[in-house]
Amino acid sequence: MKKLLILLLIIAVLASICGCAEEEPEIQVPVNFYYRRTQVTFEDSNGVIAPEVREAQGHENDLSYLLDLYLSGPNGEDMERTFPYGTKLVSISVSEERTTVTVTSHFANLNNVNLTIACACITKTVMELTNTSSVEIKAHGTMLNGADSVIMDNENVLLLDDSAMDPAMN
């Protein structure tokens, strides 16, 4: 009888331990933050970037807060930090068609494909947050690859390589 009681006690303890796993809170107000993937793929419309779904935490209308959160980097292991450490938001202005984002000069340390990917990530993120059709990106007090700014929209954010796909499948 004692052995049965001890066995039941052990089962109860194990069951309670298994039930104590911390559940991730349900996302109430999701926002998509786009980052570079750790494993590059060209099999979908995002290519080398992908969205990480995050909680707006009651700040869904506070673009400065959301972009500061975004620039702090991804939470998931399947995404890479897209921006140099120290990159912060300086200003953001939204017009009917375009959002202008100015970040600290750390961003100007990017060039070539890394700058293109980072700008694509910011563009996709900001266009979803603001519902504007293009994004102008500036680095405070410096140039980006020899230009004052980079302007992107959905047409020049295409990172999909569909050259190996059968045209009949499209």
Where are the model-predicted features located?
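Bimodal "functional hotspot" detector
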Residues: 4-9, 15, 19-170
